[in-house]
From Swiss-Prot:
<dbReference type="GO" id="GO:0005739">
    <property type="term" value="C:mitochondrion"/>
</dbReference>
<feature type="binding site">
    <location>
        <position position="52"/>
    </location>
    <ligand>
        <name>Co(2+)</name>
    </ligand>
</feature>
<comment type="function">
    <text>Methylmalonyl-CoA epimerase involved in propionyl-CoA metabolism.</text>
</comment>
<dbReference type="Pfam" id="PF13669">
    <property type="entry name" value="Glyoxalase_4"/>
</dbReference>
<feature type="binding site">
    <location>
        <position position="124"/>
    </location>
    <ligand>
        <name>Co(2+)</name>
    </ligand>
</feature>
<keyword id="KW-0809">Transit peptide</keyword>
<dbReference type="InterPro" id="IPR037523">
    <property type="entry name" value="VOC"/>
</dbReference>
<feature type="domain" description="VOC">
    <location>
        <begin position="49"/>
        <end position="178"/>
    </location>
</feature>
<dbReference type="GO" id="GO:0046872">
    <property type="term" value="F:metal ion binding"/>
</dbReference>
<feature type="modified residue" description="N6-acetyllysine; alternate">
    <location>
        <position position="152"/>
    </location>
</feature>
<protein>
    <recommendedName>
        <fullName>Methylmalonyl-CoA epimerase, mitochondrial</fullName>
        <ecNumber>5.1.99.1</ecNumber>
    </recommendedName>
</protein>
<dbReference type="GO" id="GO:0046491">
    <property type="term" value="P:L-methylmalonyl-CoA metabolic process"/>
</dbReference>
<comment type="similarity">
    <text>Belongs to the methylmalonyl-CoA epimerase family.</text>
</comment>
<dbReference type="InterPro" id="IPR029068">
    <property type="entry name" value="Glyas_Bleomycin-R_OHBP_Dase"/>
</dbReference>
<keyword id="KW-0007">Acetylation</keyword>
<keyword id="KW-0170">Cobalt</keyword>
<feature type="binding site">
    <location>
        <position position="174"/>
    </location>
    <ligand>
        <name>Co(2+)</name>
    </ligand>
</feature>
């Protein structure tokens, strides 16, 4: 009987100990997250959806075949865009798309990328914004560099600007007017 009482007393003491710890933790700690120092109360521009992920490829037909024949995606014909120095194949993924990029012409921005990355790879991500002019001005104030001084017309016929990868965690980010 003594053992049972002793075990019950230990259990009651342990329960009491744990309930005191739980109480002090609940009272002594705050789990709220402080507001970000970069958050503004009324932003002048807003991020939209992911428009596309662009992948530089050394063999456009082979890459197209993979997405079309192996994964079953809807894949466009090759679209030459000489003003941008690329040939593009658009891969429809339902909620977004991919752009398969291949160099076109001697001044292609993709040539240097493929020289460094022989097998190809992710080139950039494109995110829509509701006001590209306001976004550019705001990002300049925040010391985020862009690859051009102002937005230019992109492959989709809309204004775009590329942000410097060194200011974006190593990722080339394209902002596109929604």
């Amino acid at each position: 009987m003594r053992r049972v009482v002793k075990a019950a007393a230990l259990a009651a003491g342990a329960t009491g100990l744990f309930s005191r710890v739980q109480t002090s933790v609940a009272i002594g700690r705050s789990f709220s997250t402080p507001q970000s120092q970069f958050q503004e109360s009324s932003p002048v521009w807003k991020l939209g959806r992911l428009n596309h992920v662009a992948v530089a490829v050394p063999d456009l037909e082979k890459a197209s075949s993979f997405y079309r024949d192996v994964l079953g995606a809807q894949v466009s014909e090759v679209v030459p865009l000489p003003e941008h120095g690329v040939s593009v194949v658009f891969v429809n993924l339902g909620n977004t798309k991919m752009e398969l990029l291949h160099p076109l012409g001697s001044d292609s921005p993709i040539t240097g990328f493929l020289q460094k990355n022989k097998a190809g790879g992710m080139h950039h991500v494109c995110i829509e914004v509701d006001n590209i002019s306001a976004a550019v001005m705001d990002l300049k104030k925040k010391k985020i560099r862009s690859l051009s001084d102002e937005a230019k017309i992109g492959a989709h016929g809309k204004p775009v600007i590329f942000l410097h990868p060194k200011d974006c965690g190593g990722v080339l980010v394209e902002l596109e007017q929604a």
